[in-house]
Amino acid sequence: MEFKDRKLIFDDSTIYFIDKDSQKKHFVMMDWEHNIMKAHADYACSNGGDILEIGFGMGISANYIQQNNIKSHTIVECHPAVTNNAYAWAENKPNVNIILGDWFDVKYHLGLYDGLFYDTYGDTKAKQLKDYLPTFMKNKGVATWWNSYNEKNNQLGIKADSYSIIDVNPKNNNYFKFNKYYLPKKEFK
């Protein structure tokens, strides 16, 4: 079953789903990520201008992106329930454009951006992002992405220019087990 077809459960501090076979919770996003999301948003917005956010989740990074001096904020989200939350969140935010769909399926409808933040769950095309990332970026644009590992083991295969190291204290979850988070940074020239 694809992620976009799963029934998600939203509460104040998490998004998760229950695996039908194992009956285990699979966490999609949790509120302990705030400082990571702020750092990603601040880097993605470091040039101002037009920002592309792939994945909305709980809207944590979107809130931080909106706190920056930006021109536009395009959000691509594949899960219909998360997209509905994004539409509600974007009400009265005229610089926000929400696109329902997988980034790979809508890639030719996207423009050029000064900054990009990629953080999705269950993206079967994630490893292809490295091939398309340059086509989304303006000259001197910057990109960052969720990194579940470390600076030597980047699951997307994108070569970062540098990393910021953030101390974290993750709650019990099934997607991040470390006390240090390596935030990847990439500039396009």
What is each model feature region?
Residues M1-G49:
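Class I SAM-dependent methyltransferase Rossmann-like catalytic core
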Residues M58-I70:
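Conserved SAM-binding loop of SAM-dependent methyltransferases across substrates and taxa
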